């Protein structure tokens, strides 16, 4: 870190992560921030901060709905310049490529066109159905195809979405609660089923 910027430790970079058991949705590790020597309230960035997900959202909002519509990894898609649209990170365009290649190379133009075909409303409905909290207002904007949200997403939401993909589409709601008992010790909720 740059000592001129972070000598007081207030401006150092922060990070957050949520790791879950994909088969259950149970949180196994969570990082909410750097260690802080503060009394009182501290922000847990894994649950309370919403950030732009960038390309990590593409499988969830673009490609899963596109595959469910009947396309395959071998479907031919167009990687081409889009007027008033995104550019690819490397500044190049490959023309006709397979969806598999587009995903593996994270081609922004393909993600943009896929969501445009599906409609942002359809793509955002996948997020809403998986418990994403702050995406409802972006359902008309194609920028969400490449992670451009008004408020962003949390690491907890992203972990749940990827767990759903890992479980062949079976929803995995993320939870830190493993069990709840009533005053008599009877189990009223058990996350294991």
Where are these regions (language model features)?
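Periplasmic/cell-envelope proteins involved in peptidoglycan metabolism and beta-lactam response
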Residues: 1-47, 51, 56, 74-75, ...
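Active-site SXXK
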Residues: 25, 50-77, 102, 160-165
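Glycine-rich, acidic and aromatic/proline-enriched surface loops and short helix-turn segments
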Residues: 19-36, 68-71, 95, 104-108, ...
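Second-shell loop/turn segments in exported
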Residues: 5-6, 44-52, 87-92, 98, ...
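Active-site-proximal helix/loop microenvironment
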Residues: 133-188
């Amino acid at each position: 870190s740059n000592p001129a910027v972070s000598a007081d430790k207030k401006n150092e970079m922060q990070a957050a992560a949520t790791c879950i058991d994909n088969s259950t949705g149970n949180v196994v590790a969570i990082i909410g921030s750097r260690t802080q020597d503060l009394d009182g309230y501290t922000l847990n960035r894994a649950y309370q901060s919403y950030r732009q997900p960038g390309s990590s959202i593409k499988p969830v909002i673009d490609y899963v709905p596109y595959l469910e519509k009947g396309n395959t990894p071998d479907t031919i898609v167009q990687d081409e310049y889009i007027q008033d649209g995104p550019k690819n990170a490397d500044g190049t365009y490959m023309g006709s490529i397979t969806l598999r290649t587009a995903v593996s190379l994270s081609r922004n133009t393909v993600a943009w066109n896929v969501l445009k075909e599906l409609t942002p409303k359809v793509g955002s409905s996948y997020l809403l159905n998986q418990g994403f909290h702050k995406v409802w207002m972006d359902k008309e904007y194609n920028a969400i195809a490449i992670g451009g949200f008004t408020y962003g997403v949390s690491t907890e939401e992203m972990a749940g979405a990827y767990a759903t993909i890992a479980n062949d589409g079976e929803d995995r709601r993320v939870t830190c609660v493993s069990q709840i008992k009533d005053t008599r010790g009877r189990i009223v909720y058990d996350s294991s089923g």
